[in-house]
Amino acid sequence: MEPMNYLVRRGFRPSAWKYGKWRPIGKTVSERRRISIQPVPSVESNTVNASYLPAASTPSSVTSPGLCIVSNDASFEVLGSPYSLLSVSLSASQNLYTRRGTLVGLTGKSENVVSTLRLLEPLRRAALRMPFLYQKISSASPVNALISVRSPITSFAVVQLDGTVDWMITQRDALLSWTGHALTVKPTLNRELSLVHWGSSKVTGRGLLAVVGKGQVYSINLRAGERYIAHPSNVVAYTINSHWPRPFRFKSTSLKFQIPKLGLGTLLMKSNFLRNLADSDTWKATMRIFHTVRTWARRTIWGDRLFLQFEGPATVLIQSRASRIAESLTAREVNEIASTQPGVTREATETVEARLEKQSPPPAKDDGMKTVGQSVASVRRDGKVEFEKVDGV
């Protein structure tokens, strides 16, 4: 399957069907840089390294060799078409962490293999509804293991980290296996204006990482200054840079009315009856039910209007089959994105910059006093006073 490319153009060229092909009509318009979207993994070397993922093609048959990513102590190779098996080659004393129940087979000296069940931060991961049961496999001699998942519509992507760029795994069940003594995987939770970091895993260090996605996994490479908007349920992972993903909603056609502000809310809250009603348990329970129904409607009915905007330089991995919006965003994140003004993404950044400008020390003020000259007064014997101006001042 050839790589898909989204072409960003300034204009639109109509096409006509002629001789079995679509041919453009009219003059050629100027083009901008193409934001390439390539499937991963593939036959050619398309390691997701610190900066880019080269264009690649997919295998043409089941027997075609898969992608092989080699590090110092291990190698990951994706097999099958579609990519349904992960072959892991481990050297001696190298640890492999894989999700429980994903080990298919193993070759090598089985008497030297040690497999233990590890609980990776069970309290935090359970609170975030993330898998925390992983199998640690190590051997005193080199071995080769096969890893797969139960889902029939899942494909693999291999990420190689060199220690210069960190990755964020957004989907809760996307993290499959990893290896590397210097590789660290930690669940993250941003208690402030978090976007897709609820239930995410931050990966730092150096090593190999295997992620799974529903359907086919594609890579989107953004250069500095480029932007890309993606649905949060389709985002599998992305590189961490100074520009965090921001909420985005497309503008919708709506009829707006200008209603004068009469201050009825302030007048009504002056009533003791309404204030006591707002403090009652019945009113609080009713408002909780209302907010729950509103969040459910935003997730179920208007969930396709919630997007995230990425800004380059960055690499984003997306999956062709989207997961549920509830698996990517929490109730608080859905309400935050839905409450943002459509088409506005830099409001929070401008607010922070304005606060920093206010906190900066004010420049020194000029008191307005300036020496314009100097005179010397002398008193004569007859009582007269003479003023003499001093030159050079």
UniProtKB/Swiss-Prot annotation:
Region of interest (Disordered), ranges: 341-377
Presequence range in chain numbering: 1-32
Classification via InterPro entries: AIM24, AIM24_sf, Trp_RNA-bd_attenuator-like_dom
GO biological process, one term: inner mitochondrial membrane organization
Highest rank taxon of the organism: Eukaryota
The keyword Transit peptide is annotated on this UniProt entry: yes
Keywords: Mitochondrion, Transit peptide
Gene Ontology CC terms: mitochondrial inner membrane
Compositionally skewed regions (Basic and acidic residues) per UniProt: 347-369
Subcellular location: Mitochondrion
SUPFAM superfamilies according to UniProt: TRAP-like (SSF51219)
UniProt similarity note: Belongs to the AIM24 family.
Protein's name in the database: Altered inheritance of mitochondria protein 24, mitochondrial
